[in-house]
Amino acid sequence: MSLSNFNLQSKVLLHPLVLFQIIDAYERRAKDVPEVLGTLLGIVAGKTGRIEITNCFSVVHRMHGDNNCHIDLDLKYDNDMLELAQIAYPQEKVVGWFSTGKAVSAAAVELHEYYERQCHSGQPLHLLMDTSLRGQRMNTRIFCAVATGVPGGTKGLMFSLLPMDIYFGSPDIVAMRHMGRQCALPPKEAGRLLPELEQVVDATKDIQQKLDLVLRYINDILNRKRRPDNTVGRALHDVLTSVPMVEAERFRHMFNTNMRDLLMSLTLSSMIKVQLQLSERLSNMVDA
């Protein structure tokens, strides 16, 4: 769909869920990634030309070149996420891409060419969200690329603004009102950790304190502030050699896997507890 096809009756409707998903992706980005981008999904009404942007997901990418004018996308990840999204919501199609930043990036032309092939319904849209909070607002804009140039000469693309409305359905209104009420409440103190997680935290702190003690002892020996003790040295050697040599990345993966298993067990136990409580209440209602 080109810009010329947009008339007064044509609208781009943006669901608030998309904004929250972009903010979540921006907050969870890696430290060396300044901005995030991803694929927009939505529904295109063929007769009215109305486009509803209902969903999105971030895409792994790498910027390079002068002024980051070139971009490499993880196409396999993008295709896998698109397949999963369409299994859950088959009516949603690719309608464009989103990115964070203050202005349209230099790589927007390459992204437009890629998403033009992905969009079977027409021209891809570009949603730009300014996360710098200038003026205490998160400015969000929608662009559409328009071909420019003269016949027989150099041609290019110009990204022009399109009118956009944020669409609130009944569930969205209920959720936004609840969030508004929660924001008006005074901040709450952080709740206590679950007993299982407290044990992990306490054990980690205990190990950290003992490691600090060992490091101070070794540094004092090396700096000749303390006389070496062969008995202590042999004991430390036996302790250190008893620990298997594991790469940092592998250890991190093993620890995170065990932590996920623990959290999954806690979640399942909580669900079973709630299920039993509901069953008990339903049984009492039937008996009454």
Curated annotation (Swiss-Prot):
UniProt domain MPN: residue ranges: 12-149
Primary location group: cytoplasm
PROSITE patterns in alphabetical order: MPN
Biological process per Gene Ontology, one example term: formation of cytoplasmic translation initiation complex
InterPro entries: eIF3f, EIF3F/CSN6-like_C, JAMM/MPN+_dom, MPN
A GO cellular component entry from the record: eukaryotic 43S preinitiation complex
Pfam families in UniProt: JAB (PF01398), MitMem_reg (PF13012)
Localization, UniProt: Cytoplasm
This protein's UniProt keywords: Cytoplasm, Initiation factor, Protein biosynthesis
Family: Belongs to the eIF-3 subunit F family.
Described function: Component of the eukaryotic translation initiation factor 3 (eIF-3) complex, which is involved in protein synthesis of a specialized repertoire of mRNAs and, together with other initiation factors, stimulates binding of mRNA and methionyl-tRNAi to the 40S ribosome. The eIF-3 complex specifically targets and initiates translation of a subset of mRNAs involved in cell proliferation.
Assembly mode: Component of the eukaryotic translation initiation factor 3 (eIF-3) complex. The eIF-3 complex interacts with pix.
Protein's UniProt name: Eukaryotic translation initiation factor 3 subunit F-2
Taxonomic path: Eukaryota, Metazoa, Ecdysozoa, Arthropoda, Hexapoda
Annotated gene: eIF3f2
